[in-house]
Amino acid sequence: MLQRIISIFVLGLYIVCSACDVYASEHHGRRTCKVFLMPLLLGYYVLNANMVSTFLCAALVFGWIGDLCLMKDGKWPFVFGLTAFMIGHFCYIYVFTRDLLIYSIRPIYYLSLIPYLIYLALSMKHIVPHAGRKMRYPVMVYMVVLLVMSWTALLRCLASGGLPVWIGSLLFLISDTLIACRTFLKGEYKGIMLTYVLAQFLIISGFIS
C-alpha cells in the first residue's frame, strides 16, 4: 500500500514538473524542472515494474544526461546531448528486439519500414544539408538510430502488442525532428517538450503491467 502511494506521488510530481517545463519551454522561462523529469520517471518505473530492466533504466539515465546537455547553448553541449540520447535509443532498441525474439515476425511486417524510409529521405533532403559540414554525418547517424528505434517498437507492437510503446517512439521522433528544425532551419517550433515527456512516459508505461 505504501509503495502504491509513493508511486502515485512520484507520478504526480512527474506530471507537475512536465507541465511546468512544457510551459517554460514555450514561453522562454527558466527550465528548472527539466532536471527532475527523467529521475522521477525512473523512480516511477522501478516502483511499478515486476521485473526492472537495466537497459530501460539506462535509457532514462542517458535521456537525463541528454536533457542536462541540451539545457546549455553551443555546439558541444548539443553534440554530447545527441550522443547521450543516441545511446539511450540503442538501449530501447535492445529491449524491443529482445522481445521480438520471442515472437515470429511475418514477412509482411517488414513493409512497415517504407514510411520510415520516406521520412529518412525527406530528412536527408530538407534538414541534414542545413546541419553544416561537421555536423552533417552525426545528425544522419542519429536520425537512422532514432528511426530504427521507432521501427523496432512498431515491429514489437505488430508481433505482440505494445501500442503505447510505439506511440511513444513516434512522439520521440516528432520531438527530435522539431529540435532539428529549430536548430538547423531556425525559427520557433512548438511542442518539443510536450511530445518528449509524453514519449518517454508512454514508452516506460508500456513495460509496466
Q: Where does each model-flagged region fall?
A:
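Polytopic alpha-helical membrane-helix bundles and their juxtamembrane interface segments
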Residues: M1-S209
